[in-house]
Amino acid sequence: MVYVLRWIKDYLEPVIIEAVKGSPYPVDQLAAMACRETGWKIEKYLNQKLPYATICEIMKGDYGQRAGDAEKIYHGFGFWQIDIGSYPEFVKSGNWKDPLKCCQMAVNVLETKRKYFLNKTPGLKGDPLERAVTAAYNCGEGNVFKALINHRDVDFYTFNHDYSKAVWGFRETYKDLK
């Protein structure tokens, strides 16, 4: 994934820097989240030699049929996989194709999760809070709260049970890129 993280640094870091201004989220966190959310798709598209603009236009994922869907559809949009079920207006606007707008939306989603945990778990601070917020980006704050009150890891309900752990690993690799 170093190759993908390098691409994220080269192509997405400028928009990430802009999107996180004034927020508590560091650049490496949003870069690592993009890698966790869409790194495999980025790698696939780079192997196909697709240009950046094309990748921005076609970055969709989480294809399947959820309860309530009439048929299979994409549920995640943009490098940060904004969920159509949670943010339909944003997705339908097409703003997910603009990396800056998509990253700003990801920051807004994280901030919603942060406010939830600051309200529901005022004793949660520092790295445990940041991991909870990050895990909630993947599986929802209710699931992470349920994990916490049952003394489980914040990633218990995340995809592959490792979302925030994987993001933290990608963060460390990203920080080491020159």
Role assignments for model-derived ranges:
Residues 2-23, 59-178:
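Non-catalytic cell-wall polysaccharide-engagement segments
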Residues 31:
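Histidine-centered catalytic micro-motifs used for acid/base chemistry in nuclease
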Residues 34-39, 138:
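Catalytic metal-binding/acid-base residues of hydrolase active sites
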Residues 37-71:
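Conserved alpha-helical segments that form or flank metal/cofactor-binding pockets of metalloenzymes
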